[in-house]
Amino acid sequence: INMSHFFHKIENMSSPHLLAAIDLGSNSFRLEIGRESHGQITRIEYIKETVRQGAGLDAERNLKLEAMQAGWDCLARFGERLRGFRPRQVRAVATQTLREARNADAFLARARECLGFPIEVISGPEEARLIYLGVAHLLPQSSEKRLVIDIGGRSTELIIGHHLEPE
């Protein structure tokens, strides 16, 4: 995740601030902490835990209790690390597995308590947009169209864009 595009534009920040991004993916949950200074974000910490939540969906598309517990345990550890952060410093998003799970609301209610921050289940197009922006900012500027492919645990995004804008 390129954190500079994970957050809404931050106005009037003259001193360095910490920001955190949490990605609840199908295979792993990730926590990335960065320091914002003068419009730039520098990563200072990255934690990735393999929870395999997508593999915990049963035939009826419900998350099994073991998969939910693994997610809650991970988010509790992330929450401990984020103690002292304010809600405006943290953005947590969930992707395909929680878009798909019929009992996502039950998981998310406790997940928010474990983490201590809101968790947003983002749409496929929003996930693709964030992926494209993150990749585009890491590549050299080009006037050519770009194709970015993200192969995830339960979904694959193909995003075409130009410069820093996904189409």
Description of each model-found segment:
Residues 4-24, 32-151, 159-167:
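Nucleotide/phosphate-binding catalytic cleft detector across ATP-hydrolyzing
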Residues 156:
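Metal-dependent DNA phosphodiester-chemistry modules and their immediately adjacent helices/loops
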